[in-house]
Amino acid sequence: MRTHYCSAVNELSLDKQITVCGWVHNRRDHGGVIFLDIRDRSGLLQVVYEPENKEIFAIAEKLRSEFVVRVTGIVRKRPEGMINDKMETGRVEVIGIQLEILNQSPTPPFLPDDHQIINEDLRYKYRYIDLRRAVMQKKLTLRHKLNSCIRNYLNEQNFLDIETPMLTKATPEGARDYLVPSRVHPGQFYALPQSPQLFKQLLMMSGFDKYYQIVRCFRDEDLRADRQPEFTQLDIEMAFINEEDILQLIEGLLKVVFKEILNITLPDKLPRMSYKEAMTRYGSDKPDLRNPLELIDIADLVKDCDFNVFASAANDNSGRVVALKLPNGCDLSRKDLDNYGQFVTIYGAKGLAYIKVNDLSAGMAGLQSPILKFLSETAVQSILNRVEAQTGDVIFFGADKAHVVNESMGALRNKLGHDRNLINPGWQLLWVIDWPMFELDPQSNKLQPMHHPFTSPQELSAEALRSKPTQTLAKAYDIVINGYEIGGGSIRIHQPELQKTVFDLIGIDEQEAHEKFGFLLDALQYGAPPHGGIALGIDRLAMLLTDSTSIRDVIAFPKTQTASCPLTSAPSPAGNAQLTELGIRLAPTITTK
C-alpha cells in the first residue's frame, strides 16, 4: 500500500515516485494550491496538490484534519525560501498525482499537536488520538528500543527468557493482591503476581542458571506519579553467583542502555553507598546525588540546651536532631518559611525551626530566629561551625524520632533543591547496599523484612540471626538514578532452615509457612543452589530516559490516579449471571447492572 514512511523521503528520493500513507496533520490553501502535511509515526511530509489535475484537486479540497489518506507523488526539492530545517523532510516536498481517502474523521476533541496543553482526563479518554502526537510516538518508540536493548544484552550474556504464571497463589509481599475468582473451583481465588519472585527462584533450583523476563506485575495499592496498578519490570535471576556478579551485570546493562539510547557513556563501576550512610546524609534510601544539600547531625551539640524540642530528641535513643544548611537562603520571606514549615508536617514533623545568618561576623546579633533565646551562644557557635555557615545562609532543623526526621528533612532537602534550582544537570547513578535485614513496624512493634522474606542475611547462621535480628544486614542492593529507585534485588536464602528462621522472626509460624510457602520450602530441600537476582522498573527507567514527569507518559494505555481507565471505563460492574457462575455474591452496599 505504501513505498515509504514519511521521514524516509529525502533528497535521495528526488524525481522518484513514492507512496505514503498517514493522517492529514495540516491542510493549507495558498493561491489556489493545496499544501498537506501528512503524518505517520516516523514524522511529517509536505505534499502539494496543484489545480491542473481537477479530479485529484477536488478530493484534496475535501480533506480535513485526521482524515486517513494514501498519497502518491513525485519528490522534488522545495523552492528557495520554503525550506524548513526544523522538519526531517524539510528540504523536499511531494507533488501529488494520486490521492485516496482511506477514512474520514469528525473534528476530534483535540488535535494531536504537541503545542496544545490538553487536560489529562481528556487525553486518556481519547488515548488513541493522544498517542498520535509526535512526543508520545517518540516516547513509546524509545521504550521499544529500551526493551530491545535489554533483550539483546541479556541474550548475549547467555540468559534465557522464560515465562512464569500470571494466575498464581496469594502471598504476603507488602501490598494487596489482585484476586481472580476460579469458576472451576468455587470459592477459591488466584492472585495476579506482584512479581515472579518465587517462580524465578524455583527456576534456579530447576537448573536454569540465568533467567530473565520483561514481565507485567500487579499491585492493588495507592497510586502516585511513579506507580500504576499494573506495571512492567525486568526480572533477572542467576545461580552460583554473589552480590558482585549481579552489580557488575546491571552496570554493564545500564552502560549499554545509556550509550545506545542517549549516547551517554557511564563509568564502568557505579558509586556505592550503605543504607546507613544514605539515611544519615540524605534522609532517604534513594538519594538524588545531583542535589548538593545534606543533613548534618547535631544531637551531641544540643543535648544539654534549654530548647526541649532539641534536647528531648537528642537524648532519645530512637531520636535524631539534624541541621540542613541552605546557602544564600536569607532571601526567604516569612511566608516562604511558614510554607516550608507546613510542608514538613505532611511527613509527621511538628514544625520547622530555622536560623537566618544575616551577618556571620556580628555574632548572635547577626542571627535571626525564634529559637535563639533557648540556645546558648556556645551551642549556636558550635552549630554554625559544624555546618560551615556563611553570611546569607539559612539553617533548618529537624528534631524528633529518627524516622520522622529522616522522612521530613529528606523531603525538605528535595523540595529546596528543586525550588532553589540547586539540582545539577546530568545523571547520578548509585548503588545503595548493606540494607538492614529487618525493621520494626511502628504500630505492631513486630519485625518485618526490609525487602522481602526470601532475602539472605549477610550472616548465614540462624543462631546469629535470632540473637541480633535488628542489627543484621542483608545481602540486598538497590539501584538509584537521579533520586528514583529503579530496581532492587538480593541474594536469596537457599537453605531451608535459614528460611524457616526468617519466617519465624517475622511472625509466620511453621503451619502458616507450609500453607503459603510449602512448595518453596520443599524445593529448598532438593539441592537449591546459591542464587540471587534483581528487578528493574521498566516504566520508571523509560520515564527518566524520556525526561517525563510520570510513568503514565511512557505507558500506552495507563490507569489514572484512581486506578481507572477513562478509555474503556474499567473497572466496571460484573453482571449477575457472571457473578452467579463464579459463585460470588456481593455485599448489599455494592450493586451491579
Swiss-Prot record:
It comes from the Bacteria. Signal peptide: none annotated. PROSITE patterns: AA_TRNA_LIGASE_II (PS50862). Disulfide bonds: none annotated. It is found in: Cytoplasm. Residues 197-200 are annotated as: Aspartate. It catalyses: tRNA(Asx) + L-aspartate + ATP = L-aspartyl-tRNA(Asx) + AMP + diphosphate. ATP binds at R219, D220, E221, Q228, E485, G537, I538, D539, R540. Coiled coil: none annotated. GO terms for biological process: aspartyl-tRNA aminoacylation. InterPro entries: Aa-tRNA-synt_II (IPR004364), aa-tRNA-synth_II (IPR006195), aa-tRNA-synth_II/BPL/LPL (IPR045864), Asp-tRNA-ligase_1 (IPR004524), Asp-tRNA-ligase_1_N (IPR047089), Asp/Asn-tRNA-synth_IIb (IPR002312), AspRS_core (IPR047090), GAD-like_sf (IPR004115). Keywords: Aminoacyl-tRNA synthetase, ATP-binding, Cytoplasm, Ligase, Nucleotide-binding, Protein biosynthesis. One of its GO terms (cellular component) is cytoplasm. Its EC number is 6.1.1.23. The keyword Heme does not apply. Pfam families: GAD, tRNA-synt_2, tRNA_anti-codon. The record marks H30, G81 as: Important for tRNA non-discrimination. L-aspartate binds at E173, R219, H451, R492. GO terms for molecular function: aspartate-tRNA ligase activity; aspartate-tRNA(Asn) ligase activity; ATP binding; nucleic acid binding. Its main location: cytoplasm. NCBIfam families: aspS_bact, PRK00476.1. Belongs to the class-II aminoacyl-tRNA synthetase family. Type 1 subfamily. Aspartyl-tRNA synthetase with relaxed tRNA specificity since it is able to aspartylate not only its cognate tRNA(Asp) but also tRNA(Asn). Reaction proceeds in two steps: L-aspartate is first activated by ATP to form Asp-AMP and then transferred to the acceptor end of tRNA(Asp/Asn). Homodimer. This is Aspartate--tRNA(Asp/Asn) ligase. The gene is aspS.
